Structure formats: C-alpha cells, structure tokens
Amino acid sequence: MNKNNRTLLAALIALSLIAGFATYFISPDLNKTVAQGKGEGVTTKFDSTIQLTQEGTENSTITHNRINNAQFPIDKSQFKRAPEFAETNGYINTAPIKLADLREKVVLVNFWTYTCINWIRTIPYLVDWNEKYANKGLVIVGVHTPEFEFEKNTDNVKAAVDKFGLRYPIVQDNNKETWNAYENRYWPRIYLVDSGGDIRYDHIGEGGYAETEKVIQSLLQERAAQMDKDASLLKFDNANKTAIPNGVQSVDFSQIKTPELYFGYQFARKPLGNTEGHKANQTVTYTFSPSDIKSNIIYLDGKWKNNAENMELESETGRIALVYSAKSVNIIAGGNGEEISVSEGGKLLSGTSGGPDLSEEGKFLIDGQRLYTLSMHDGYGNRSLILDVKGKGFQAYAFSFG
C-alpha cells in the first residue's frame, strides 16, 4: 500500500471513529442507564445525552455537546413530550402555572402526597436541589395527588408544605388529571423535563439521588449550551459526588419485613386478624386474645366503624395491636384531640426509641389528619406494638414502616 493510500485509509478510520462516537453521544437508546433496587425505587427511563459511561469507570460529564469543536444536534425523536399540567384544584407557593410557561427551564416534576413516608424521606434531597439549582435554571414543581380524601383539603396540604419547608411551586391534582396524563401509578415519582419540554429521566420511588442530581446538572449544562452560554461556567461543587443533606433517614429495605398495612375495607390488602373481619359501613365490636396475635396483621379491640378508607372508633376507648418487623413505624391517623398511648413489649415507648410525635410519657394527641411517627429504633427487629386510644372519633388509616 503506498503512502497516499495509507494516509487516505487512516483518515477514513478516524472519521468512522468520530461518527461512531457521535452516534453514541446523541442516541437515547445507546446511552441509557436503567437502575433499580428493592424498595429503593426504579429508574424506568433515563437518558443523559451529555454523560458517557464506560464499564468499570465513573460517569464522566461532557461540559459541551461538542466533539472536536463540531456541533452535533441531539436526536429527540425518541423522547416523550412532557404532558401539560391538567385540570388543577389549586396552587401553593405560586400563581397559576403551566409547564408551557417553563420552557427554557429544566423542570423536575415530583408526584407526591403528604402522608406518604416514602415521599417524606425524599424531602431533604428535594429541598437541597431547590436551594442549589433554582438560580441556575431548575424549577421543581410538586404535583400533589392525594391518596386519601382528606388530602384533597387545601389547608391540610398547605400545613404540610409549611411543616416540611417546601419553597417551590405546588399544584393540587385532586382528580388525578395530571397523574393520569403522565400515566403515573406511584408515590413518589420524579420526571426530569429538559428545557425543550421533553422527558429525559423518570425515577419511581426512593433512592437514585446521586444519579438524579447528575442528570439535573447535565440538563442544566445542556440548557446553557443551547442558549449559547458557556456551559463550562456552570460549575458544580459536587460534580463527582452527591452530599447527603441534613435530615435524611437511612433505610435498609431488605430489613423491613412488614408491608404497608391499611385499615379501611376498600384499601385493605390483608384481612384483619379479628375473626369478625371487615364489614363495610358497619359498626363492629372487636375483641382479640394476645395469644392469637400473628405477625404483620392488624388486630382491633373496641367498637369500630368500618369506613372505606379508615377504621373509626365508636366507643370511648379502643386498642390496636400489631407485631411488626422494622426499625420504625408510622400511622396515618385523624380525629380531634384523642389521646393515644404507645407501648412496645409491654412498656410505654420513651427516650430515643420513641418517635418525634410522642411525649416523654409515650403518648400523643391527634392534632390533624397526617402521618405520626411512633417509634424510631437504632436497629431492625421484631416488635409488639400496642396503641391504646382514648376518645371517640379517632380514625386509623394505615401503618407504614422504615
């Protein structure tokens, strides 16, 4: 082969390599990561056209969507257009807002409901991202889609927004119009929408925080480049790692052996432990023997009305018993000032094992329809929980665990 031919061949090989690299760089199918973990959530769709991952190496961020100073357009034909926020029932922290109003912004759409413990455990990250990236082009929009009827109440949602320190826009989705438009079925869920209005990332449940933050950073850099700004000036202190914000609750889902348990006959996934069982819309006098209690099943004592979403105490006193396996337990409850004493292993919960809603005497008062944290132990294990209720009208909706 003569020198000219060798030179021509080398040039063709170089061009082929560049073309192949560019195809990888702009293809959503070839540059896709799917991450999943038991109880920690699932990333069902993920594309970051400005992140390249090699096996055995850390993700490396490409600041500009350029190769050898040549501009390659991003092929968005396979991305799904983010649906508009549908019929809404109110706005918090914002005037009426539409997704179309946020073009040229990177938008994090977060589906939540305020009594969901899984969403509550994501709050420190949402607050942290809002503080770090709001002035760099990120807008978080919380779409509050209720699980229970009382979560449709705007005052209840506002109280939760204040309690959790949320400063970003909230849209009330009481009729699940936006929920259905996104074909969502989970709390919590995060969609990342790029500055052009396409969904580029979709994560179900908890976890995936480092990955989510990297995609936020990548989309912000992409936005800067598309706006003819120098994306290299958009620097991130934690480009290679995600700091854990204050207030994060550590959870090992493999150690939680008790599933979420619902009280209402329409929501219950398991029958009651009592032989009387559920009787729709009827008031039933329940009894149980401590020797009959089995793990992961709710037992009641007293006169309770069977409502679709909850059990409502009709007698002046009542009792709830549960043997669970986890590190912490919460109850979603409502009423009006009823007093509940919480004990485990025959002793009132107090000290570090008692949840933040308990007094030093192991008691708490119902002050609204919300989630109450009853226990927070240092380690996982099997525990026998008793709730002694004083006051007619107490409503129990669900137990959740951590």
Q: What residue spans do the PLM features occupy?
A:
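Non-globular targeting/processing and membrane-anchoring segments
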Residues: 2-90, 213-402
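A short beta-strand-turn-helix
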Residues: 84-107, 133
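Sec-exported extracytoplasmic/periplasmic mature domains
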Residues: 87-90, 121, 128-135, 162-165, ...
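Short active-site neighborhood of thiol/selenol oxidoreductases, capturing the structured segment around
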Residues: 96-120, 126, 139-141
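Structural recognition of the beta-strand scaffold that forms the well-ordered cores
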Residues: 107-110, 139-143, 169-172, 191-192
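Active-site-proximal beta-strand/loop segments in catalytic clefts of secreted hydrolases
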Residues: 111-113, 143-146, 173-174, 203-206
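Structural microenvironment flanking redox-active thiols in thiol-disulfide oxidoreductases
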Residues: 120-163, 172-178
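Thiol/disulfide oxidoreductase modules built on the thioredoxin-like
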Residues: 162-166, 172-215, 374-379
